[in-house]
Amino acid sequence: KEKDIWLKPENIEFEESAAIPLVALTAHKALIEIAQLSKGSYVLINGCTGGVGSVAVQIAKSLGSEVSGICSTNNLEFAKNLGADHVIDYKTENVLEKPISYDVILDTVGNLKYSQSKKILKPAGLYVTTAATIPAMLFGPLLNVFRQKKAKLVMNSPNSKTLSEIKSMVENNQIRGHVSKVFKLEDVREAHDLSERGGFTGKLVLKM
């Protein structure tokens, strides 16, 4: 379908182009459409060096937000290079003990629950997740009616307007995709195994 077509930006190669659409659509939905991020907002991104998280950092910075990112020790430098203003090593630091509160918390991993995040959200803050459990999906909207600090789940679908916006952001060097490794088609099992193990930055690409 036409709405599902992603036209390759002219300033990047095909491998990088393949790594961008899905994660950028998800990050765009979370930060621009749901959170309506604005200049000066304080944003926390859990999993800031993964596929969605790495693009989310760049989108948030392009909007003028102050970005804190959570990642592992090995990826601290990568997170800084993405533009994160503050980087938290989850292996040695506890974000819940930091003396700072956020306008938006984006959890792309699934291990920073809304019940935990409430203590570091501002009074009108918003928690957004791309990795909610089924119970959260079923009961979250009902519970939110009674809460000032709302929690939202990202439900994503392609559309040509957003893809066009993302293409422009890439061409204006506001966001870039990061390819951790490119696999040949015959190495699909190896790619799947690495995907299941995790621990890499950005995305894996399968070359047809």
Task: Enumerate the language-model features and the residues they cover.
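Terminal helix/beta-alpha structural elements that buttress the NAD(P)+-binding lobe
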Residues: 1-208
